[in-house]
């Protein structure tokens, strides 16, 4: 699949006048355990700027003040509050887990709680350290849901068993067959590609100026935001355009910047989406 103007406009459409925040999806973001609090903040900033209607963050209690200082638009709670966690999980259209989650006991419990309670009609985006935790589980034990994986090459190696040198298109497609049907894979590298079944979209955007902390967290937030607000659109197309836009904005910023900060990408998302929707 190729990214062109037609595909972009299939996804990023003008908003209906008679709509409200509930029309654009409810999101639960899980992560940001010490010392990785900034990761979930960047994911949340990207998610809100991408247009998700209601964004709630489950994170360390100590991280909530910092989150609200950067993003008062998001709600937040201590991810150790199990009942509140489950209530927000059940209410979400899209769940993102992994940005700054870590791999300690609390992180493992959070992932287990999500996997045990996610429903078949919900989208689950798995990023960062949650991918490493997921790699330790049997694929046959994964829940039935709309699964989106966003690994870099080393994380995909752990998930698929494919060494980086073996991660060809055909090998990656075969490895993806081990996950439930319809799983979407954002295979991040200097040549990022988005897979679903026999489909693959190679993205000819992005560059080394994106090699900085938080870039993947921002992408995961954008993917989550697009899935939430464009729920009536084909999920694969929504993920492709979110991933493309992330790097297209970076390309533009890099014309006058040696390094592109993830937060600069997030700030630019609304204006880019406005222009692309016209």
Region spans (language model):
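Small-residue (G/A/S/T)-rich helix-start motifs and N-terminal tracts that mark the onset
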Residues: 1-123, 132-146, 153, 157-278
């Amino acid at each position: 699949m190729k990214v062109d103007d037609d595909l972009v406009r299939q996804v990023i459409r003008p908003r209906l006048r008679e709509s409200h925040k509930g029309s654009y999806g409810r999101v639960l973001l899980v992560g940001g355990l010490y010392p990785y609090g900034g990761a979930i903040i960047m994911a949340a900033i990207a998610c809100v700027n991408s247009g998700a209607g209601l964004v709630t963050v489950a994170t360390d209690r100590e991280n909530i003040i910092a989150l609200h200082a950067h993003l008062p638009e998001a709600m937040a709670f201590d991810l150790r509050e199990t009942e509140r966690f489950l209530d927000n999980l059940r209410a979400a259209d899209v769940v993102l887990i992994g940005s700054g989650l870590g791999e300690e006991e609390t992180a493992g419990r959070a992932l287990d709680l999500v996997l045990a309670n996610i429903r078949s009609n919900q989208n689950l985006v798995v990023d960062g350290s949650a991918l490493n935790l997921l790699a330790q589980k049997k694929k046959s034990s994964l829940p039935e849901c709309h699964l989106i994986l966003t690994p870099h090459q080393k994380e995909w190696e752990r998930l698929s068993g494919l060494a980086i040198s073996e991660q060809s298109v055909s090998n990656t497609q075969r490895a993806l067959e081990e996950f439930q049907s319809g799983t979407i894979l954002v295979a991040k590298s200097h040549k990022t590609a988005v897979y679903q079944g026999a489909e693959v979209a190679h993205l000819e955007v992005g560059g080394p100026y994106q090699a900085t902390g938080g870039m993947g967290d921002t992408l995961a937030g954008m993917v989550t935001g697009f899935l939430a607000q464009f729920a009536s659109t084909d999920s694969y197309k929504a993920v492709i355009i979110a991933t493309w836009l992330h790097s297209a904005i970076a390309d533009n910023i890099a014309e006058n910047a040696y390094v592109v900060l993830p937060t600069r990408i997030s700030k630019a998302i609304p204006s880019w989406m406005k222009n692309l929707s016209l």
